[in-house]
């Protein structure tokens, strides 16, 4: 790529997986253009950095680009993709561009069905504390950077590895992390065996001198371990793990001791609440230790971690109602987030606004979604965020609400759109409530609307 390609066009440039890559490319001196359907904060940030970005997709947006990079959500019948085909411009997925950036550094790829963004961010905090000056590309806004990415001068590139379309197999890291393996992205994988095969291939791609840092507590990971032919470091709470957390205390923050092969490395104080974040922190420590960072430096890095956007993010308080936002959109993520909410704020009534994400996911995991909200006092449910998918007959937010009522005692109200949900907030919320907005789409705007007093 270096010396041959200078002009890059990115379709879906404002997406969580794309904007970080775009920022690094801009900082490397490439000419970056692109398009997105929405004028988001990410788009505005990239424009300030020098990117030329169109709102809306059109063939006329593709002019003299030397390569077109498309996000996972962009289909091959997109007008800009078709224009690139007609012009003979190479078309690549975002993971292939990420692989090119990683090829120039020592790559560390954080994968798994859940927890990738937080784990990558925690790992970045450790590498920053160690003074390694890493390049970092993640799927959320890291508070320490104020963005999804940074270009460093050091030898390491830390990246969130997206398994959703199998393109994480383009990457060639020296250290992998696998946080968990659950059924998801059924629009691509169709069944558990397909996603298992992808993760097996991913873990076996590390070189013989590399390492897979994997969660030994996760049933999906344990199922795959006999087929992994490369080095493995397991982490978790269980006694069989090589890297373990003990004496765990979780409230609004987390505290635990870390043991490696039985040796006590010290105590971690983490601003992130929840046992799932203890596991994420263990993964980050494992990466740090495997790359030669001292244990005390790893622990200091975690203590200084300032959090990441949309991961149990405390947004503010109004009228005695505390508003928290989280990206969780898979039943397993929802369960972890709700457990954390109960642990952090045991005295508050828990009101959840949930926006399902993708028709295919809602259909495939319908039964799990119906049982996921047993732990809430009030559920506000809206329509499915399509994420470029076509509707599936019989699959909707309303059908999910009906399913929840049939299998649980959850008090659920369905709203066709955000306007209707916002209008119901004054009668729904009361002083002392915890109002949790939950989902990978735009549900966070409902919480912000309430805080703004509109």
UniProtKB/Swiss-Prot annotation:
The record, for Gene3D superfamilies, names: Mur ligase, C-terminal domain, Mur-like, catalytic domain, NAD(P)-binding Rossmann-like Domain
- The reaction(s) this protein catalyses: UDP-N-acetyl-alpha-D-muramate + L-alanine + ATP = UDP-N-acetyl-alpha-D-muramoyl-L-alanine + ADP + phosphate + H(+)
Give compartment(s). Cytoplasm
Keywords linked to the UniProt accession = ATP-binding, Cell cycle, Cell division, Cell shape, Cell wall biogenesis/degradation, Cytoplasm, Ligase, Nucleotide-binding, Peptidoglycan synthesis
Please provide the Gene Ontology terms (biological process) for this protein: cell division; cell wall organization; peptidoglycan biosynthetic process; regulation of cell shape
- List the pathway annotation: Cell wall biogenesis; peptidoglycan biosynthesis
Gene Ontology molecular function terms on file: ATP binding; UDP-N-acetylmuramate-L-alanine ligase activity
- Specify the enzyme's EC class, one word: ligase
**One GO cellular component from the entry?**
cytoplasm
Which residues are involved in binding ATP? 112-118
Which Enzyme Commission number(s) are on file for it? 6.3.2.8
Listed InterPro entries: Mur-like_cat_sf, Mur_ligase_C, Mur_ligase_C_dom_sf, Mur_ligase_cen, Mur_ligase_N, MurCDEF_pg_biosynth, UDP-N-AcMur_Ala_ligase_MurC
Question: What Pfam families is this protein classified in?
Answer: Mur_ligase, Mur_ligase_C, Mur_ligase_M
**According to its UniProt entry, what is the function of this protein?**
Cell wall formation.
Entry's family note: Belongs to the MurCDEF family.
- Any idea what this protein is called? UDP-N-acetylmuramate--L-alanine ligase
From what organism does this protein derive? Oleidesulfovibrio alaskensis (strain ATCC BAA-1058 / DSM 17464 / G20) (Desulfovibrio alaskensis)
């Amino acid at each position: 790529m270096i010396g041959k390609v200078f002009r890059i066009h990115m379709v879906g440039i404002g997406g969580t997986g794309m904007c970080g890559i775009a920022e690094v490319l801009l900082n490397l001196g490439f000419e970056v253009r692109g398009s997105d359907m929405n004028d988001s904060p990410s788009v505005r940030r990239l424009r300030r950095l020098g990117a030329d970005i169109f709102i809306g997709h059109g063939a006329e947006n593709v002019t003299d680009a030397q390569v077109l990079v498309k996000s996972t959500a962009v289909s091959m019948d997109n007008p800009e993709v078709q224009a690139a085909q007609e012009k003979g411009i190479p078309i690549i997925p975002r993971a292939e561009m990420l692989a090119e950036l990683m090829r120039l550094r020592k790559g560390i790829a954080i994968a798994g069905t859940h927890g990738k963004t937080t784990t990558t961010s925690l790992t970045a905090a450790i590498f920053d504390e160690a003074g390694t000056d890493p390049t970092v590309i993640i799927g959320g806004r890291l508070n320490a950077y104020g963005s999804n990415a940074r270009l460093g001068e050091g030898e390491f590139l830390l990246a969130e590895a997206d398994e959703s379309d199998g393109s994480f197999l383009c990457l060639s890291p020296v250290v992998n992390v696998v946080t968990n393996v659950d059924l998801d992205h059924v629009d691509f994988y169709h069944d558990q065996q397909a996603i298992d095969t992808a993760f097996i291939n991913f873990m076996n791609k590390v070189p013989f001198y590399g390492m897979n840092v994997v969660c030994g507590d996760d049933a999906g990971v344990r199922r795959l371990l006999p087929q992994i032919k490369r080095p493995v470091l397991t982490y978790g709470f269980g006694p069989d793990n090589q890297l373990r957390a003990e004496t765990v205390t979780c409230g609004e923050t987390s505290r635990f001791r870390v043991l490696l092969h039985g040796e006590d490395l010290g105590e971690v104080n983490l601003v992130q609440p929840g046992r799932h974040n203890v596991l994420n922190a263990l993964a980050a420590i494992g990466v740090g230790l495997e790359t030669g960072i001292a244990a005390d430096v790893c622990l200091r890095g975690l203590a200084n971690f300032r959090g990441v956007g949309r991961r149990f993010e405390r947004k503010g308080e109004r009228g005695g109602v505390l508003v928290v936002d989280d990206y969780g959109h898979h039943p397993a993520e929802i369960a972890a987030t709700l457990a954390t909410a109960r642990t952090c704020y045991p005295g508050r009534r828990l009101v959840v606004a949930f926006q399902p994400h993708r028709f295919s996911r809602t259909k495939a995991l319908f039964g799990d979604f119906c049982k996921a909200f047993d732990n809430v006092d009030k559920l506000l449910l809206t329509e499915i965020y399509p994420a470029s998918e076509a509707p599936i007959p019989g699959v909707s937010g309303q059908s999910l609400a009906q399913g929840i009522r049939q299998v649980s005692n959850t008090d659920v109200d369905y709203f066709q759109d955000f306007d209707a949900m916002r209008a119901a907030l004054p009668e729904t919320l009361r002083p002392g409530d915890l109002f949790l907005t939950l989902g990978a789409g735009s549900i966070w705007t409902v919480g912000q609307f309430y805080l703004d007093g509109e």
